[in-house]
Structures are given as C-alpha cells and as structure tokens.
Amino acid sequence: MIGGGNPILIQSMTNTRTENVDATVEQIAGLEAAGCEIIRCAVPTMEAAQAIGEIKKRVHIPVVADIHFDYRLAIAAMENGVDKIRINPGNIGSLDRIKAVVDVAKERNIPIRVGVNSGSLEKNLVEKYGGVTAEGLVESALDKVRIIEDMDYDNLVISIKSSNVMMCVRAHELISAKTDYPLHVGITESGTVLTGSIKSAVGLGLILGQGIGDTIRVSLTGDPVEEIKAAKTILKTLGIRQSGIEIVSCPTCGRTSIDLIGLAEKVEKLAAGYEELNLKLAVM
C-alpha cells in the first residue's frame, strides 16, 4: 500500500531489456536485496508486455509497467499481471484509447501512475505560463487526472518530474495543496552517480522534509543499485527511516596518522549488511 500514511517506499527501474526475462529477474533480485521495494520495467514491445507474467512469477516486489505511446502495451501488461502501470495520457492517444486502458485497470483494480515531465509539457501550457514552469506541470498533471476521473476511476498515483531541482520542489508544493492522491517523487535525468545523488538529495530532502511524497526514486545514470543506496541514505538522513548503521567519519587533516579514508570505506562496506540495526558508528 502506498499513500494514506503508509511508509515511503523506494523504487528503481531496470535497465535490462524486459524481453530478456532471466537478465531482468537477476537485476530485480539484486535491487531487492539492496532494499528496492517497487520496480519499474520498460514495456516498449508486445514481447516485453508478455514477459511481465514470467517476471512476476520470479520476483517478490511489485512490478510497474512503463508505457509510452501504445495503449495496447498497457492492456497487455495488465493482462499479464503487472501491479501498476505508468502512463502519460497525453501520449497514449485518443480518449477512446485512454478509456480502453482505464477499463482494464478498473476491472482488475490496477493503479495507474499518471506521469508528466518538464521535457514534454504541452505547447499551450508553455505559452500560457511563458515557458516550462512548476505551475504548468501541475496544471498538466491535474488535467490528465481529470480525464481518468471522468471515466469513473481514481486508483491513481501522480508523478511530476523535472531535471530542474527547484522547479520540481515547487511543483510538489503546489500539487500537494491541490490533491490527496499519492505522489511519486524524484528528480528526473539527474545525472551520474555523484552529481545525480547530490541533486536528488537536495530535491528530495526539500520535498520529503515538508511531508510530501509517498514513493521515491533517485534517478541515476549508473548501476540501479546505487539508486537504492542513495535513496536509503536520504530517508535515513531525514529521519524518515531508522534502520541501518550510520557511519560518521573524520574528514582527515594533516594530523591524520593512519589510512583513515581506506578504513572508513571498509567499515562502510562491512556495515551495509546490517539493516536490522539502528546504530551510529564513528571512524576517527
């Protein structure tokens, strides 16, 4: 369960070809072991949609199908047992096609994540607000939510993404004041492991620190396991999660007489496997 006061869950996305079931399952297993709680898989082909069924049999966390453009892929993924679908109603096509997706979701009570992105904001909203803005993103998201609500379905999650950290923060402040739907939070296209982790820590810290957000993803250009490590650290730093060992260590100076950097790195690796402990370890 997400939203409604439930704990914030950590999400990632596979970068394997979903059609390659063995590779995808292997990656999901590694992510789950690292602490991933929801996994999203790209579904660009009918073969990928059909692979969802076999993937579901072999993993232990909810699977989300990421759909673009072809509404039939969303339907096929749901027919193959996916737990949630992510769509942008604006690129699915006509209202009839959106309704076809909503009807299947309604029949199976499958949540729909409605996603909007600053990189694809509608031209009329860009013109209305004089550029890509937080206000435009929120209006776009709520317009798409209303389309689905008008089809008598409200099992929805909203996602507003931007690579502009402060725009993303502002958009979440605005939309959280306008709706009670669960929000998936992340800074999209944030960069490589170092840069992306820092941008995500700033953005997610500002958003989650206001009590906004129900699921998170730290989007990185790198090994998805690094996304989980960063997300867990962000949640622990904010005091949202208490499990795991926190390492504090001296930044070193001219008085340092041992290999403190190497020692701190070794301790951090050793401590990573003790999620059940809530400790602070000092390396000085």
Model-based region annotation:
Residues 1-13, 106, 263-269:
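N-terminal amphipathic alpha-helix/helix-capping segment at the start of soluble metabolic enzymes
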Residues 4-23, 42, 61-69, 90, ...:
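Active-site mouth loops of central-metabolism enzymes
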Residues 12-21, 32-58, 86-94, 155-165:
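Glycine-rich, proline-tolerant flexible connector loops at the mouths of alpha/beta enzymes
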Residues 35, 58-61, 78-85, 106-108, ...:
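Glycine-enriched alpha-helix->loop->beta-strand junction motifs that scaffold or abut catalytic
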Residues 35-37, 80-95, 187, 210-224:
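Glycine-rich phosphate-binding active-site loops on the catalytic face of alpha/beta enzymes
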Residues 45-67, 100-112, 174-183, 265-272:
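Alpha-helix-loop-beta-strand connector modules within alpha/beta enzyme cores
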Residues 72-113:
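Hydrophobic or amphipathic alpha-helical targeting/insertion segments
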Residues 117, 125-282:
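Catalytic alpha/beta core domains of metabolic enzymes, predominantly
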